[in-house]
Curated annotation (Swiss-Prot):
Its main location: membrane. Coiled coil: none annotated. It is a multi-pass membrane protein. This is UPF0259 membrane protein ESA_01554. The chain crosses the membrane at residues 21-41, 87-107, 115-135, 138-158, 194-214, 218-238. Belongs to the UPF0259 family. It is found in: Cell inner membrane. The keyword Protein biosynthesis does not apply. The keyword Transmembrane helix applies. Keywords: Cell inner membrane, Cell membrane, Membrane, Transmembrane, Transmembrane helix. GO terms for cellular component: plasma membrane.
Amino acid sequence: MSITAKSVYRDTGNFFRNQLVTILLIALLCAFISMMLGHAFTPNADQLAILSEGDAMTNSASLFELVQNMTPEQQQVLLKASAASTFSGMFGNTLLVGGVLVLIQAVSAGQNVSALRAIGASAPLLPRLFILIFLTTFLVQMGILLVVVPGVILAIVLSLAPVMMAQDKAGIFRAMRNSMRLAWRNMRLVAPAVLLWLLARAALLLFAPAFAALTPQIGAVVAGTLSNLLTALLLIYLFRLYMLIRE
């Protein structure tokens, strides 16, 4: 059977519209959890003020120079803030991916499931999913940091890994390996969706200052919810595409 991107986009849109309320609640809940974790673990205002002390900011031409020119105390605060942001974001993403994938599976099986139940039912999957997201995020960011293009290619070929882990009960490295093979063979169907997702998230970052004007906490939840909705759309597309490819 010939698979066209247009038909998969249509199926994705139909599913998203039919399950909009549940998907929105999952996206909002995960964004709220990420914000709360980030707020709990991020250094307080007095500690963050240490980062602006000295000439490290003005005398540094690159990120590496900036870190090298910092005092040990400043480096410790920066590390703590970065770790808090990374962990809270990854934890929220893990809940989102797990909840959305369980929702898709349940609806495909003819079952009605709430946002909380979808996230709760994904609990057995979350530890492996967290490690998978950590590894793929690390590889993609390193690729983007080096030359950009390798990072984008990695984002494309690894995009099916969470779907394979949930649907086939695959292990972490097996899911990554199989995703690379399958996505590479179906690049014309996978790449446009992932690239659109990356561009949409980049565009969302441009509006981040406007969201922050609402108050940092509310802005973070609004921006996080919108970002999560974009990710949910991509997951629905990839899940539908994977099921069609398997047929």
